[in-house]
Amino acid sequence: MHDTFKGYVAPWECDEMGHMNIQFFADKFSQSLLRHLFFLGENSKGTPGTLRALHMRFHKELHASDLAAAHGEVSAFEKENGVLTHFMRNEENGALAATASFHLPLEKMPDEVTPLASEAAPRGLTPGLLFRPGMEAHEGLTETNLSAVRGHECSAEGGLSLKGYFSRLSDCQGHMWRLAGLGRQEQKARGLATATVELHFQFFGALGEDDLIAVHTGLDAVGSKTLHYRHIFFNGKTGAPVAAADGIGLLFDKETRRAIALPEAVHESAAYHRL
């Protein structure tokens, strides 16, 4: 186990939900991964161009002025492929905030492999529910993001950073909830907010400076309190899919911070955008 990150939640990293936005979890975890790879003697920088997948679970919110700390461990290694799992905690009370399991090639045999902790293991997003090649052509998808990669969003290696992907995912969420029948303004009027509790990102290609991005979104399943959404990232110049994110989202009451049942309008609207 290696201590790999220690930082602070700045007020500007928090959104209208009252907690740290998902893109800043991604940013802090990517810094944590970079230090872990250094400790392991790896040359990889762990950028999306080298990552195969990333699985995240969110357990407790982090708020402005909270202290965040992370450590990493090797959860699997086989035939030069590894899984590095990172745990981020609120350093004030020790509560586990989130986990991130990075699937990537490793050049060296690690000294120690620790079985994947239950807190980091897939829960709602089992392998059979995830995006598979060919699904990008599904008619149920709706365009939720059109953007371009700016230079400041890229790593030293030239590709769009993990935070850059998650920044767009965060933007897409507002459009996704509107598709689901409960847009941001109505949420605000009703004292509601949204959160992602589990996320699985897959990477198939790289995006560089000035590349165009298009994201298409659909809903795969809706339960009593959660919905399964999918964002597919395309290279806007070639039309090729470069990444896909499957997530489990929920609604919560902003006052009690507790999850609530999805309104009937969500079930009705989601039926028109289901994958």
Q: What do the PLM-derived regions correspond to, one by one?
A:
Residues 1-60, 64-67, 178, 253, ...:
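Hydrophobic, helix-prone linear segments
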Residues 1-35, 39, 124-185:
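Catalytic strand-loop segment that frames the active site of acyl-thioester-processing enzymes
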Residues 2, 49, 95, 138-140, ...:
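A generic structural signal for short, non-catalytic loop/turn and secondary-structure boundary residues
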Residues 3-5, 57-67, 74-137, 203, ...:
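HotDog/MaoC-like acyl-thioester-processing domains
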Residues 8-14, 52, 56, 148, ...:
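A generic, residue-level signal for flexible/boundary positions that often mark functional hotspots
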Residues 45-52, 80, 96-97, 195:
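A short glycine/small-residue-enriched secondary-structure motif
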Residues 51, 72-74, 196, 219:
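A structural signal for short, hydrophobic beta-strand segments that form beta-sheets
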Residues 152-246, 250:
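Structured core of small recognition/catalytic domains
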